[in-house]
Amino acid sequence: MLRFGEVDAVSTTMKLHILSDLHTEFADFVPPETDAETIILAGDIGVGVEGVRWAARHYPARPVIYVPGNHEFYGHDIDMIAELKAAAPENLTVLSDDALVLDGVRFLGSTLWTDFKLHGEGEAWFARERARRCMNDFVRIRHGRQKFRPEDSVVLHEASRTWLVRQLEQVFDGPTVVVTHHLPASKSIAPRYANDPLNPAFASRLEDVIERYQPTLWIHGHTHEPCDYELFRTRVVCNPRGYPGEYGRGGFKPEFTVVV
């Protein structure tokens, strides 16, 4: 586990500036000035290393935590995490099933690919096949010499979930913030998408993990509808900009911050 800072974990408070799904591959974004100590980027900032480079330009001094989304991998191999980390300056940390302790706050970061079991094991095969036909993830991302497949997503999900549970089992004397790109609970699905057949490609059922370990805050992206709610004793938030045609309709707050 990486560690920065030597501040008393119990007395620490930290303001986080939270953004996701900026999709700078379609239109640039100039973030507002913020007094937040730490910047959280929950994926789909830009394609490949361009999102990391964007963050490095706009946040040259303060700590940045960057969790890759699905779009970071478009046109690239699913195993490009080393490239993202190599492109990051010293103040920016890419988390991909990685933990970071920063000034008394523990951050656990994972893309959290889905297992397609949102509606249960019996529906998972149908969910995978719909995603295979309809999701660009399984067209535009490579896995070695093949295309990335829903079955690969399941393997990655299981590895990430196992890693996350092991981290949460470790006692930590301070706030714990989980940052994922994909949705951790069905409650994060916006009401207008409640019956969307592709929801299992966006969200997984980690409600049991949240109930058992109750991290302080869970930040995610992927859906282009903001959310902010309590699940057990965990606050769950998402603050996505979305695609150019969605600007102004979803409730994105460029200045959104949370104190932990």
Where in this protein do the model-derived segments appear?
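Short acidic-hydrophobic surface loop/beta-edge motif
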Residues: 2, 96-103, 227-231, 256-258
